[in-house]
Amino acid sequence: MEKSKRLFMKSKRSFRRRLPPIQSGDRIDYKNMGLISRFISEQGKILSRRVNRLTLKQQRLITIAIKQARILSSLPFLNNEKQFEKSESTARTTTLRKKKYRN
């Protein structure tokens, strides 16, 4: 091989394919909270299909199951993990405004 052709040939890296997030025996159902909670973000949002690595049909079923669980109040609509602490109230200097009288 010529040197110029060798520069363009890259070695192929082997990659390990990740396991699918939903196994064949898993039932996508609103009662299966362990499965559903894997597809929700920390904020309580439904994660996208690319992030989940799901098929279109699986994503649709997951979305429906999450919405059913929210309606039946098994899942919260918003997941506020952050507890807002009461910050020390900043001392406001309130000055009384004097009314200006126009003659």
From Swiss-Prot:
Q: Which compartments does it reside in? A: Plastid, Chloroplast
Q: Name one GO cellular component term.
A: chloroplast
- Region (Disordered) location: 83-103
Q: Which UniProt keywords are listed?
A: Chloroplast, Plastid, Ribonucleoprotein, Ribosomal protein, RNA-binding, rRNA-binding
Asked whether the keyword Transmembrane is assigned, the reply is: no
List, alphabetically, the Gene3D superfamilies matched: Ribosomal protein S18
**Molecular function terms from GO:** small ribosomal subunit rRNA binding; structural constituent of ribosome
Q: Write down the InterPro entries for this protein, in alphabetical order.
A: Ribosomal_bS18 (IPR001648), Ribosomal_bS18_CS (IPR018275), Ribosomal_bS18_sf (IPR036870)
Q: Which GO terms describe its biological process?
A: translation
Cross-referenced Pfam families, in alphabetical order?
A: Ribosomal_S18 (PF01084)
The similarity annotation says: Belongs to the bacterial ribosomal protein bS18 family.
Q: How does it assemble?
A: Part of the 30S ribosomal subunit.
What is the official name of this protein in its record?
A: Small ribosomal subunit protein bS18c
Q: Which organism is it from?
A: Glycine max (Soybean)
